[in-house]
Regions:
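EAL-family c-di-GMP phosphodiesterase catalytic domain
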Residues: 1, 15, 31-35, 48, ...
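Structural preference for long, well-ordered alpha-helical segments in enzyme cores
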Residues: 8, 41, 61-62, 75-83, ...
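N-terminal sensory regulatory modules of PAS/LOV and PAS-like folds
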Residues: 12, 41, 55-58, 75, ...
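Conserved ATPase "switch" residues in P-loop NTPase domains
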Residues: 16, 87, 150
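A short, well-structured catalytic beta-strand-centered motif of the EAL phosphodiesterase domain
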Residues: 22-60, 79, 114, 179, ...
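Catalytic core of bacterial c-di-GMP phosphodiesterases, primarily the EAL and HD-GYP domains
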Residues: 31-40, 65-141, 217
Length: 283
């Protein structure tokens, strides 16, 4: 381990123990009617000395040095508590929560998640657990764990689909409920013919297996229109909303419902041009 990584790990451990991390929530909406279908919980760490630290830096260290389980439990508990607050305020939605392949090696993990849902008063069918495609490789070991999640009523999404090496047979064998199409296939839409073909193929595959097809990284109206034309069910990205602080979600939902009818109309480019620019500047 480098000195920089050691310092980062020590700082992260202190931040986790002191609950100095925070969660933001990025909405996902249905392409059928613009309705909020779920929100994805995303961890953020703003260190006083290091500044904002990307999860791509601290999550791998947490996985390698025994901190991923406490991070997961803190994040899940915080997310479930926030769901209950939203519900008390009149907002109904589902939750999407990312889990590490390391956590999936725990035999008691499905039971732990179920107990946490029960303790927080959150029905298990309100929770969708997201796994990156790379995490699905040890299929024989994961099959039992993932099946137990499904038996308990939780949804399972395969994230960043198309960027790893999982076979179509493996996708069929695993009990997923949702496929998330990676943003690398979305960014060149609608002009790139090969990207259109790949997205169409993934959507057809997902629907053929009875899965929901979600497009990530939607940043322009043209991309939104294209994935809708290609048959996607759900979209997520900065055109819809950046990751939001929990207190901002209800206000966003109210305003987005007003904007949705015009989003796919001929006037939408004029109406939404400033929104696109503003949200992208927040990245």
């Amino acid at each position: 381990m480098t000195a920089a990584d050691r310092k980062l790990l020590e700082s992260f451990g202190r931040a986790l123990a002191a609950q100095k991390l925070r969660l933001v929530y990025q909405p996902k909406v249905s392409l059928k009617d613009g309705r909020l279908t779920r929100v994805e919980a995303l961890v953020r760490w703003d260190d006083p000395e290091l500044g904002p630290v990307s999860p791509s830096r601290f999550v791998p260290l947490a996985e390698q040095h025994g901190l991923i389980d406490p991070l997961t439990e803190w994040g899940l508990r915080t997310t479930l508590k926030q769901w209950r607050t939203w519900r008390e305020q009149g907002l109904e939605t589902r939750l999407a929560f990312n889990i590490s392949a390391v956590s999936l090696q725990r035999l008691d993990f499905p039971d732990l998640v179920e107990r946490m849902c029960r303790a927080m008063g959150v029905p298990t069918d309100r929770l969708v657990l997201e796994l990156t495609e790379g995490a699905t490789q040890p299929l024989v070991r994961l099959m039992d764990t993932l099946t137990r999640f499904r038996i308990k009523g939780m949804g399972l999404a395969i994230d960043d689909f198309g960027t790893g090496y999982s076979s179509l047979l493996q996708l069929r064998q695993l009990p997923f409920t949702e496929v998330k199409i990676d943003r690398c296939f979305v960014k060149d839409l609608p002009s790139a013919h090969d990207s259109r073909l790949i997205v169409r193929t993934i959507v057809d595959l997902a629907h053929g297996l009875g899965l929901v097809a979600t497009a990530e990284g939607i940043e322009t109206i043209e991309q939104l229109r294209c994935v809708r034309e290609l048959g996607c069910d759900v979209v997520q990205g900065y055109l819809v909303a950046p990751p939001l602080d929990p207190g901002d979600l209800i206000g966003w939902d109210r305003e987005f419902k007003k904007r949705w009818p015009a989003l796919l109309s001929d006037e939408s480019l004029e109406l939404w041009g400033d929104v696109e620019a503003d949200t992208l500047r927040q990245r």
